[in-house]
Amino acid sequence: AAHAGGAFGFGAQRGGKGGNMSIFSDGHAAMQAFNPQAGWVFAAIFGVLLLASAIAAALKWRLHGQANATIDNLNARINAWWVMTAVLLLAFWLGRIGTIVLFFLVSFAALREFLSLVESRRADHRVMVVCFYVLLPLQYWFVLTDWYGMFSIFIPVYGFLLLPIIASLGGDTDHFLARTAKIQWAVMISIFCLSHVPALMNLKIAGFEGQNILLLVFLVAVVQASDVLQYVWGKLLGKRKIMPALSPSKTVAGTVGGIASATLLAAALYPITPFSPFQAALIGLIICIMGFLGGLVMSAIKRDRGVKDWGNLIHGHGGMLDRVDSVCFAAPVFFHVVRYFWNG
């Protein structure tokens, strides 16, 4: 891997070349081959899942068929992780286009969940149609064609202006600002933030050509591991709640232990990245903190709407947004840190 140097261990490469609107730009953009190193990471994940499944099965066996909500929920969570990991592996194996399609579908599901919880009126229906059938496909088209200029400003600028314009044409001014702002939030979180995950495939990093899929593996593995480890440490040692009004299940010990453990995991994964061990740990710490804060923000929104979960799409986990809320906040930061310091 090509390691960057400079202040705080980061390189001086910044900016990057704009996209040329070609799906096959620079030869790497069409379908990057699945990297063997990513395969080893997934093998380790499947190994952990196999161990977790064995432990859960043993716990259930000890109950001799008696119902236990905690054990049943644990089994449901583990089974869901098997499915999610397999789907992610398949998308990564298919390469760049498969990964973009997967996250397009994730954004679609997340947007649907978000908009289903906001108050809407008849005048908002056209706005929502634009969100699903204009903003969503165009944003991922810009990822597919590697058009960074439009990818970075389309939703924050043009989408931000377009949505209230369409809403105002409906002639309904009742709670206009609140209705429009909620839809803008839904688009930013569900489409713009999530689209930064597959956009990592478009970065051009010296000495790392054709291996960008490993950046996605690093991001998803570290952020999701942080979530799981915060839960585990919280169950083992957690007593003091960190933000009981927002997330009653989060504890100080769980948060600190989970983020610290995931940061160590990030350092251990440095061989699959263009980072040094220190850089990988520092970036891991940043994205874990962003993931934690993102989880708090999304929990605050759920509390405001009076619901426990965003949906029930993923058995044992809730909705799509319940599973990717931390990634939504970590992905843009990770993307721009890598692009600023490593992109050629």
Located regions from the model:
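Hydrophobic alpha-helical transmembrane segments of membrane transport and translocation systems
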Residues: 328, 332-337
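Juxtamembrane boundary at the C-terminal end of a transmembrane helix
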Residues: 337-344
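Membrane-embedded alpha-helical bundles of polytopic integral membrane proteins
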Residues: 22-286
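Short, strongly hydrophobic alpha-helical membrane anchors
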Residues: 3-36, 344
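Interfacial loop-to-transmembrane junctions
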Residues: 305-326
